[in-house]
A protein has these predicted regions:
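Conserved ATP-binding subdomain of kinase catalytic cores across diverse folds
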Residues: 2-102, 120-131
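Active-site-proximal flexible loops/turns
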Residues: 42, 82-85, 103, 144-149, ...
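Short alpha-helix boundary/capping segments
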Residues: 51-54, 113, 170-171
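AlphaC helix of the protein kinase catalytic domain
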Residues: 103-112
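Short alpha-helical scaffold element within the canonical Hanks-type protein kinase domain
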Residues: 114-118
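Conserved catalytic-core element of eukaryotic-like protein kinases
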Residues: 134
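Catalytic activation segment of kinase domains across protein kinase-like and atypical kinase folds
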Residues: 137, 141-171
């Protein structure tokens, strides 16, 4: 894990390359996903260094919170922050690889044939909100779906650095 900042560019398979870069990397006997967050601009470098948790740290903490509430998210492994001249320069979030597919296919407008999946997704979404978990980037690419041998569906949240935990009063 300590080698990730030095070897990130050369190792692993790119899963996503946009504002941030996600790579699947083998670490011993497990595969992990490493999310390299874009280098923040100077104002956010100051903010993340002194006033607010970095996106990597929030991802790690929120993943544990989600699990404590009884919901799935890929198992958090670590987060890494690098500082240059006392300011955050790069950060990485590492979690176990989850082979689930995103729910994008459910959002294509086709209800017929997807009734069971859509019902399960609606129940899952309601349960998240009842538990006070508000994912502020609840887009189809950030929700993974799994189907077990009994044809039951479960879901897993990813990209959780923008999340809010509500109190019972707020729910």
């Amino acid at each position: 894990i300590e080698e990730i900042p030095r070897s990130f560019q050369e190792k692993g398979d790119v899963v996503y390359d946009g504002r941030n870069v996600l790579k699947r990397i083998g670490l011993g006997s497990i595969d992990v996903v490493v999310k390299s967050f874009k280098k923040p601009h100077i104002i956010n470098r100051v903010v993340y260094s002194f006033f607010r948790q970095s996106k990597a740290e929030r991802s790690y903490i929120y993943s544990m919170e989600i699990q404590q509430h009884g919901f799935d998210t890929p198992e958090p492994v670590a987060m890494i922050e690098q500082f240059q001249s006392g300011l955050l320069s790069h950060s990485y979030y590492i979690c176990c690889y989850d082979g689930g597919e995103t729910v994008r296919s459910l959002m294509d407008g086709k209800v017929e044939g997807n009734e069971d999946k859509l019902s399960a997704f609606a129940r899952y979404t309601a349960a998240l909100h009842q538990a006070g978990i508000l994912h502020l980037d609840y887009s189809p690419g950030n929700i993974l779906i799994h189907q077990n041998d009994a044809n039951e569906y479960s879901f897993s949240l990813v990209d959780v650095n923008r999340m809010q935990l509500l109190s019972d009063i707020d729910c």
